[in-house]
Swiss-Prot record:
Alphabetical UniProt keywords: Cytoplasm, Endonuclease, Hydrolase, Metal-binding, Nuclease, Ribosome biogenesis, rRNA processing, Zinc
Class in the EC hierarchy, top level: hydrolase
Described function: Single strand-specific metallo-endoribonuclease involved in late-stage 70S ribosome quality control and in maturation of the 3' terminus of the 16S rRNA.
InterPro entries, sorted: MetalPrtase_cat_dom_sf_prd, YbeY, YbeY_CS
Protein name: Endoribonuclease YbeY
Binding site for Zn(2+): H140, H144, H150
Cofactor: Zn(2+)
EC number(s) per entry: 3.1.-.-
C-alpha cells in the first residue's frame, strides 16, 4: 500500500456472536493510530448492518482493511481503473455454487478497504463526527458485499434508505439529510 506493510503494527479483532459475521479489522497505515476506537466502531457498524438485512450472514467472515490514501489509490487503480483515492472500496467474495451448511468452513463475504485521509477530510468538510462517518462507510461497504449497489437512482435510493435505517439504530443521524435531491 502506501509503504512497506511490515512497518506497521497489525491489530485484529473479531466478533463471535453466532448470528453475526466474524469481522477482522486489519490496520495497515499508521495514520489510523490517531483514532484508537476505529476498530470498535467498525465492529459495531458491521454488526448493526448484519442484524438489519435479510441475508444469512451468520458464521460468515468480513475483512476490513484500514489503509491510507496511497493504499486505496493503488487498489482503486488496479481494480477499477480509477487512479485516485476514494473513501471506501468493497470487494465481494465470489462464492462457489451450492448451499453453505453449518460446520462448513466460514464463508467469506469479502473485503472492505477504508482510506483514512479521504474519510477524515469528508467528515471535517461535512462537519460530521469521525466515528459517525466511519460507521457510515463500514455499513456502506458491508451492503456492497451482500449485493447492494448504487448504479442507478432506484438502487441508490434503496441502499441509502437502508444505510440511514442502520445508522439510526446506532444513534447516528441521516448522512444524506443535508444533501439536496436525496430521499
Amino acid at each position: 500500500m502506501g509503504a512497506d506493510a511490515s512497518a506497521f503494527s497489525f491489530r485484529t479483532k473479531t466478533m463471535s456472536h453466532p448470528n453475526l459475521p466474524m469481522t477482522e479489522v486489519l490496520v495497515v497505515a499508521d495514520c489510523w493510530q490517531r483514532e484508537p476506537d476505529s476498530e470498535a466502531v467498525i465492529q459495531r457498524a458491521v454488526a448493526a448492518a448484519a442484524e438489519s438485512v435479510d441475508e444469512d450472514v451468520a458464521e460468515a467472515e468480513v475483512a476490513v482493511m484500514l489503509t491510507d490514501d496511497a493504499g486505496i489509490r493503488t487498489l482503486n487503480s488496479n481494480w477499477r481503473g480509477i487512479d485516485k483515492p476514494t473513501n471506501v472500496l468493497s470487494f465481494p467474495a465470489l462464492q462457489p455454487e451450492g448451499e453453505w451448511k453449518e460446520g462448513d468452513a466460514p464463508r467469506m463475504l469479502g473485503d472492505i478497504a477504508i482510506a483514512y485521509e479521504t474519510m477524515r477530510r469528508e467528515a471535517d468538510e461535512e462537519k460530521k463526527p469521525f466515528d459517525h462517518h466511519l460507521s457510515h462507510l463500514a455499513v456502506h461497504g458491508f451492503l456492497h458485499l451482500i449485493g447492494y449497489d448504487h448504479e442507478n437512482d432506484d438502487d441508490a435510493e434503496e441502499m441509502e434508505a437502508l444505510e440511514t435505517q442502520i445508522l439510526a439504530h446506532l444513534g447516528i443521524p441521516d448522512p444524506y439529510a443535508d444533501r439536496p435531491g436525496t430521499h
